[in-house]
């Protein structure tokens, strides 16, 4: 449990770091720093709720599937904007129950190209870059990742899905979560 609190403290330290001035950053990183600063200072507030993960039945034995937790309950907070092109960009921090019912913290950045179907309905496709920590991977040492991200939204609510790739007996998980803009 101590390792969990260390990982959570690490993620919480990332949040205030986004508000720092970008002038001292190298020129190649300044644009990213300015965008993160914009999201943090101008973005709306988001509530994230997690709830479901599906393990690809073709990649695991029946016994292993039965041992997994597929109700990935959890939640978190974030900030996001729709940029000058109408694309969504956000920062988030969440914690949820992983496949082994252990708490998995995650914090990151998401980007999606948004297609509007109507005034209130939208579809998105993009990616998320994140840091996470798992008990079964590197003994809770935080590690980075990047995953695809698709969404369908209506007004202030958005449903997201990502697929965690893997090989036979690991990964291959569809993870779904929601976001409420408030």
Curated annotation (Swiss-Prot):
It is a lipid-anchor. Its main location: membrane. It holds the Pfam family PagP. GO terms for cellular component: cell outer membrane. The record marks 64 as: Role in lipopolysaccharide recognition. InterPro entries: LipidA_acyl_PagP, OMP/PagP_b-brl. A lipid is attached at residue 22 (S-diacylglycerol cysteine). It is found in: Cell outer membrane. The active site is at residues 55, 98-99. One of its GO terms (biological process) is lipid A biosynthetic process. GO terms for molecular function: O-palmitoyltransferase activity. Belongs to the lipid A palmitoyltransferase family. Transfers a fatty acid residue from the sn-1 position of a phospholipid to the N-linked hydroxyfatty acid chain on the proximal unit of lipid A or its precursors. This is Lipid A acyltransferase PagP. The lineage of its organism: Bacteria, Pseudomonadati, Pseudomonadota, Betaproteobacteria, Burkholderiales. The gene is pagP.
């Amino acid at each position: 449990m101590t390792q969990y609190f260390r990982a959570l403290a690490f993620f919480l330290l990332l949040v205030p770091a986004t508000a720092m001035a970008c002038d001292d950053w190298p020129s190649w990183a300044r644009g990213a720093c300015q965008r993160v600063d914009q999201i943090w200072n101008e973005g709306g507030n988001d509530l994230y709720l997690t709830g479901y993960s599906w393990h690809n039945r073709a990649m695991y034995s029946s016994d292993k599937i039965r041992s997994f937790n597929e109700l990935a309950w959890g939640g978190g907070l974030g900030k996001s904007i729709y940029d000058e092109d109408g694309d969504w960009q956000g920062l988030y921090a969440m914690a949820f129950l992983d496949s082994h019912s252990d708490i998995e913290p995650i914090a990151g950045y998401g980007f999606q190209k948004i297609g509007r179907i109507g005034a209130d309905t939208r579809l998105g496709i993009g990616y998320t870059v994140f840091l996470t920590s798992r008990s079964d991977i590197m003994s809770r040492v935080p590690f980075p990742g990047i995953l695809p991200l698709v969404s369908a939204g209506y007004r202030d609510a958005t449903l997201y899905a990502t697929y965690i790739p893997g090989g036979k007996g690991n990964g291959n998980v569809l993870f779904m979560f929601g976001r409420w803009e408030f």
